[in-house]
Amino acid sequence: TAVLGLGDIGPAAAMPVMEGKCQLFKEFGGVDAFPICLSTKDPHEIVQTIKNISVAFGGINLEDISAPRCFEIEERLKEELDIPVFHDDQHGTAVVVLAALINALKIVGKKIKDVKVVVNGIGAAGVACSKIVMAAGVKNIIGCDTTGAIYEGRQENMNWVKDWYARNTNPTKEEG
C-alpha cells in the first residue's frame, strides 16, 4: 500500500516491484527471495498469512506497507516468529541515512550530539531514520508531517506512532 513513487497500486501492480527487489537480493546478497503480494490491508490478516507460510522461509522482508500499519505488523511478527523479520522501508532506509549523516559530519567537522536534525515525513522511513540517528547520538530532532512540526501536546493529525514520536523528539516543542 506504499510503493515508492506509486502509492497504493494494489498487489498485482506491485508484483514487478517485488520481483525486482528479489533480483537485488539474489544479485548482491546471494539470497534466493520469493515475491509475495497480499490482497489485504488488514494487519491481522497479513500477520496470520505470514505466520502460516513462515515455516518455508529463513527470514521475512516486509516491503511497501503503509504507516502506521507497518509498525504493528513488524512488531507482531518479530514477537511471534522465530526467524528474522526486516522491514526494508524502515531499516534499509535508516541505515543508509545514518551512514550519510556520519560521513557528512566528518566532512564539516561536527559531532553528532551537536546537530539538529529535521525529518520531513513521519511514516515508516522517517520514524526509523529518527530512531537510528537518536541511537547514534542525535539529541535534537524534529519531525514534520503535512500538519507541521510534531511536538508533545499537538492534537491535530496524530496517531499512536506520532504520539510516541512527540514524546521522544523535539525537546523544545518547536511548532510550525
What do these predicted regions represent?
Residues 1-83:
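N-terminal ligand-binding/catalytic initiation module
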Residues 34-36, 86, 142-144:
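Hydrophobic/aromatic beta-strand patches that form the interior of the parallel beta-sheet core
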Residues 63-70, 91-92, 122-127:
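Gly/Ser/Thr-rich loops at beta-strand to alpha-helix junctions
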Residues 2-29, 81, 95-176:
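Glycine-rich phosphate/diphosphate-binding loop of Rossmann-like nucleotide-binding domains
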Residues 80-94:
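Short, acidic/small-residue loops that bind anionic groups at enzyme active sites
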Residues 38-39, 64-67, 88-91, 146-148:
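Short, ordered loop/turn segments at secondary-structure junctions
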